[in-house]
């Protein structure tokens, strides 16, 4: 009789990862927990350390847990990226980057060190092996589906990853937590970025980057004709689609339509001016399909809570893609991800590099 497969499960301290661990044990896996530390004092050489962390008082769900301090890597790859994107006039998505650079990096490092077979997380997503390809699918709960944040994962990573919660709703997970005696069964979810206090990114940036406010204050706010209609506190403190706090009066609502970091300038316009009919995405990662060499139709999401919309994707050189939408999208921000779907399956995605390019791409592959 073969021994059970050994799974490293990422534990955040919340209800989802705890229930995922319990389900793996119920399914017969040998489970080891990994709690990744990202806000501790950095270590020169991160090592696995035993932890007293327990998710339940039940002996059935008592399993070894280790911690891994990745604070230095987190500061560089996630916090540093967050700062750089705002300073470049983009809108970053740190949770998306953290999944790839921290969570899966740490899980695979623990899998290597502990000679385990698989890794698992509490994300609401699914995988399916079809035609010798591991497909990434949406979770069945449309309110909790987290597939949008996982587009950066590769075939090698997905083939070794389990998502125990993908077939459950959040309400069902809460009920399972209570039945398993999970300590975090009633713990509220946090929607905040873990290193940004009170989810106030403006105050955070002002404190985290010395001299930022003095350096960027007083830039111009211009309308769609280029006319100066006011001044702002600094371009990093604004986001695409923002309406409140602009301090300008035009007689009708205006929204941030463009952030020009080079000239410390904010462009504003009407809601119609926020429409995006096409974009260029860079850093493409294709999951369930080979890198395309000709245009094809799919559906796209340009933010986490966005609905899937029909689009045409045209591959470009330098691992980019031109994306045109059948119906215009609202408030598309550079720095966010555009993720492509075929129904429930994630095909891939990329980072939005340019919104409403002036002309169709000149160099298309194929």
From Swiss-Prot:
Disulfide bond residue pairs: 98-194
A cellular component term, taken from the record's GO annotations: cytoplasm
EC number: 2.8.1.13
Binding site for ATP: 10-17, 36, 122
Pfam families according to UniProt: tRNA_Me_trans (PF03054), tRNA_Me_trans_C (PF20258), tRNA_Me_trans_M (PF20259)
Site (Interaction with tRNA): 123, 336
Subcellular location: Cytoplasm
Region (Interaction with tRNA): 144-146, 303-304
Major subcellular site: cytoplasm
GO biological process: tRNA wobble position uridine thiolation
Its biological purpose: Catalyzes the 2-thiolation of uridine at the wobble position (U34) of tRNA, leading to the formation of s(2)U34.
Protein name per the record: tRNA-specific 2-thiouridylase MnmA
Source organism of this protein record: Chlorobaculum tepidum (strain ATCC 49652 / DSM 12025 / NBRC 103806 / TLS) (Chlorobium tepidum)
